[in-house]
């Protein structure tokens, strides 16, 4: 469960390592984001020669949360931390690699590229 001011790790090779959620997209009263939701983020720490710089604003999709996601069969998938993948204005991933597992909940038409790049789909 991600809200404004939540910090997330970055699960791609854009050069960013940590981002700060500045807005949950999807309505003015929307407070929380879960796996598969798009958020607006600010880069808080980045590698010196990466594609992104500290202070840049991007869209991102949440790929892992410590809160987890409930499946229809009753199982709960949780992770050790919160992670996101940076997106451009067309909601396409900026990076060319994804690190760590992602969940099956991302298998929509919008995020099939992320699922195909991920090393493991849980």
From Swiss-Prot:
<keyword id="KW-0694">RNA-binding</keyword>
<comment type="function">
    <text>Binds to 23S rRNA. Forms part of two intersubunit bridges in the 70S ribosome.</text>
</comment>
<dbReference type="InterPro" id="IPR036853">
    <property type="entry name" value="Ribosomal_uL14_sf"/>
</dbReference>
<dbReference type="GO" id="GO:0022625">
    <property type="term" value="C:cytosolic large ribosomal subunit"/>
</dbReference>
<dbReference type="Pfam" id="PF00238">
    <property type="entry name" value="Ribosomal_L14"/>
</dbReference>
<keyword id="KW-0699">rRNA-binding</keyword>
<dbReference type="InterPro" id="IPR019972">
    <property type="entry name" value="Ribosomal_uL14_CS"/>
</dbReference>
<comment type="similarity">
    <text>Belongs to the universal ribosomal protein uL14 family.</text>
</comment>
<dbReference type="GO" id="GO:0003735">
    <property type="term" value="F:structural constituent of ribosome"/>
</dbReference>
<keyword id="KW-0689">Ribosomal protein</keyword>
<dbReference type="GO" id="GO:0006412">
    <property type="term" value="P:translation"/>
</dbReference>
<dbReference type="GO" id="GO:0070180">
    <property type="term" value="F:large ribosomal subunit rRNA binding"/>
</dbReference>
<dbReference type="InterPro" id="IPR005745">
    <property type="entry name" value="Ribosomal_uL14_bac-type"/>
</dbReference>
<dbReference type="InterPro" id="IPR000218">
    <property type="entry name" value="Ribosomal_uL14"/>
</dbReference>
<keyword id="KW-0687">Ribonucleoprotein</keyword>
<comment type="subunit">
    <text>Part of the 50S ribosomal subunit. Forms a cluster with proteins L3 and L19. In the 70S ribosome, L14 and L19 interact and together make contacts with the 16S rRNA in bridges B5 and B8.</text>
</comment>
<protein>
    <recommendedName>
        <fullName>Large ribosomal subunit protein uL14</fullName>
    </recommendedName>
</protein>
């Amino acid at each position: 469960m991600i809200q404004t001011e939540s910090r997330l790790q970055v699960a791609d090779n854009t050069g960013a390592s940590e981002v700060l959620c500045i807005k949950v997209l999807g309505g003015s009263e929307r407070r929380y984001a879960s796996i598969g939701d798009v958020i607006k983020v600010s880069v808080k720490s980045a590698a010196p020669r990466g594609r992104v710089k500290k202070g840049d604003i991007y869209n991102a999709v949440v790929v892992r949360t410590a809160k987890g996601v409930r499946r229809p069969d009753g199982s709960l998938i949780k992770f050790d931390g919160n992670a996101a993948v940076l997106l451009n204005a067309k909601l396409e991933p900026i990076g060319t690699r994804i690190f760590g597992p992602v969940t099956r909940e991302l298998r929509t038409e919008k995020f099939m590229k992320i699922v195909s790049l991920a090393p493991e789909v849980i």
